[in-house]
């Protein structure tokens, strides 16, 4: 792992609003998406008000940022190989909390800027956490979250506008998530062997098992409601990066990693539901590659295989951008 220290001469886009709170480090995890990751970093600086020294970029093997000057302004952590979101966000939390005065890490996926979440939100969300009766029990605040509704199935949570600003959820995608130092103090980190697929669900389940709450930011969840549907997600992503259906390799990990999720946090009934749902996925798959990946994932999941499978990895991170 190599680390680049920010240079003093770089001048990234200046913030347009108030400064981000002290004691927060923002971390962007990226793989093969320099343009999208650059957009997220620029938004962190200009919209959320982070100073460059408060921003870390974890490069998962291939990639980086689209602007050398921007790279020189923030802290770059380069992992030697692609460790998936599991290993990437594990490294992100380790980097964020190296400084003992940091109490919160703001974890961002490299494509979360495509979801048009309300900004600035970090200062607002942390202020809302402090107003909670049990603020010290908060482990994470996610931008959009889900609840289990039986046999491992989850539903998107869209809080009522008249309700509280923060609402409990069970699990979430990484998205744009605030994680408290309390989480790593209790020994909870993403499990690198999951590589990709349900590694985020496993992490948040373990946060809750450690006695901490996982909350969703109600305002962000309402703004992201449309992109939590398959059609809305595809529409948000299609112009900038391959949609999920264009990446059949994903199906392998979705099929495989539900097995350890069920074993660790569910029951045998979850596996029955998963097998039935996987059969439906095979029937509805757009091509042979996705069908083969699903069946291969089911076999490896039953056998307990974990880690990266070299046959199932990303090859294209983002679409070419038109010239300025």
Stretches with model-predicted labels:
Residues 102-113:
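Short beta-strand-to-loop acidic/aromatic patch adjacent to the donor-nucleotide binding site
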Residues 45-78:
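Acidic donor-binding segment of Leloir-type glycosyltransferases
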Residues 161-179:
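A recurrent flexible, glycine/aromatic-enriched loop bordering the glycosyltransferase active site
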Residues 183, 187-188, 193-220:
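A short, conserved alpha-helix in the catalytic core of glycosyltransferases
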